Regions:
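Bacterial Sec-dependent N-terminal signal peptides
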Residues: 1-29
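Sec-dependent signal peptide cleavage junction
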Residues: 22-42
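Active-site SXXK
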Residues: 42, 56, 62, 79-105, ...
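A short, well-structured edge-of-sheet supersecondary motif
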Residues: 43-74, 104, 205-207, 294, ...
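Active-site helix/loop module of the DD-peptidase/beta-lactamase fold
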Residues: 75, 80-84, 96-135, 139, ...
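Active-site Gly/Thr loop motif
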Residues: 207-226, 230-233, 264-327
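Short, gly/Ser/Thr-rich active-site loops of penicillin-recognizing serine hydrolases
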Residues: 273-275, 299, 337-367
Length: 367
């Protein structure tokens, strides 16, 4: 049964504290928007059986303006979020870079000398922007990368042949991020889950968000690129921090420079194939489609990202829209069988949400 409410400011703050996620204190003024168009869209997905349930939070300028759940979902529902975890992974590594223990331009072989081929010359920023030249996943017939440690994962990546020279081509995948995570582990002297908890999860109150244990059932590996699981409020706290340029509840989590680097064009001159994600969901082609762990869906005239996201194949979709000063998180997990039968793509459907928010915002401002 659908649960729908646009919460008043005090109630929202109390609820978020109760589940362990803390937001910047909401602005005192009340904001009322008609989100019925979004409600109808998501409810139709659930009614069609594509999702058993879903949750959605939308915030504007640090104030929650929509908080709703559908089907059997509650704010505490924890699911694997697939590639939505890439944003979390990049932020964790950014925290290690902030400490000076690692550089975005460090080559792989500086930390992992066993990479003696061209893969060893790829830089940390190339690993996190899918321009390293690494294969996207393990080859057909090989063991899927559902290893429980990055050390073990890297052992099975080192001997794979490179697809291209570093910097030559954008190729979205997961293996390169495993190597990036291992570099961060070595630089910080800690395992990945401990790093994530210390640098990102605990400071943000993300008590139900983890990268381990890695799912061995299929569809949610490798660890950094697809293995995170989270909840509605946990991930929204992360978005609040990114929206506020690295600060959360008055605490500095990431440097402002780190958030800028993550959002900057990291594809540069690498070739981008036609019909890549951004072109498909926004019907426009530009080369600067990716930063570090996040998509740059829309750019302004100066080339700055104004709509950033990290969509997961199963439907989870976090975004920040600078044109409306809003951010949101849609959490769900697709029923693969029913979606495939209907030709429904969870990956390409969720990105309609920020567009619907814009329509609502523009309509309200005209009245």
């Amino acid at each position: 049964m659908k649960q729908l409410s646009t919460m008043k400011n005090l109630l929202i703050a109390m609820l978020l504290w109760s589940v362990g996620a803390c937001f910047v204190k909401p602005m005192p003024r009340q904001m009322a928007y008609d989100f019925s168009s979004i409600d109808r869209e998501i409810q139709a997905w659930v009614d069609s059986g594509y999702y058993d349930g879903a949750g959605l939070v939308i915030a504007r300028e640090n104030q929650i303006i929509l908080d709703t759940c559908y089907g059997n979902y509650t704010p505490e529902t924890q699911v694997y979020i697939a590639s939505a975890g890439k944003w979390l992974a990049a932020a964790t590594i950014a925290a290690v870079v902030d400490e000076g223990n690692l550089s975005w331009d460090d080559p792989v072989n500086q930390w992992l000398p066993e990479f003696t081929d061209v893969k060893g010359t790829a830089t940390l920023r190339q690993l996190l922007s899918h321009t390293s030249g690494y294969p996207d996943y393990q080859p057909e017939g090989a063991h899927r990368d559902d290893y429980q440690t990055l050390k073990e994962s890297v052992l099975h990546i080192v001997n794979l042949p490179a697809d291209t020279m570093p910097g030559a081509k954008f190729h979205n995948g997961g293996l390169a991020m495993q190597v990036a995570g291992r570099m961060a582990e070595l630089a910080a002297g800690k395992d990945w889950e401990s790093l994530f908890q210390e640098k990102i999860a605990q400071p943000l109150g993300m008590v139900d968000t983890h990268f381990t244990p890695v799912d061995s059932g299929g569809g949610h590996s490798p660890m950094l690129g697809g293995g995170a699981r989270s909840t509605l409020y946990d991930y929204t706290a992360f978005l609040n921090m990114i929206f506020n340029k690295g600060t959360f509840e008055g605490k500095r989590i990431l440097s402002e420079k780190a958030t800028e680097e993550m959002q900057a064009d990291q594809v540069k001159q690498a070739a981008v194939a036609k019909h890549e994600y951004v072109e498909r969901v926004r019907a426009e082609m530009h080369n600067g489609i990716y930063g570090l762990g996040e998509w740059r869906e829309e750019l302004d005239f100066a080339g700055n990202a104004v709509l950033i996201s990290s969509p997961g194949w199963a439907g989870a979709y976090p975004w920040i829209d600078k044109t409306t000063n809003t951010y949101g998180f849609f959490i769900t997990h697709v029923n693969v069988e029913k979606a495939n039968q209907a030709g429904f793509s969870s990956f390409y459907s969720s990105p309609v949400l920020p567009m619907l928010v814009r329509e609502v915002y523009q309509t309200e401002n005209k009245e």
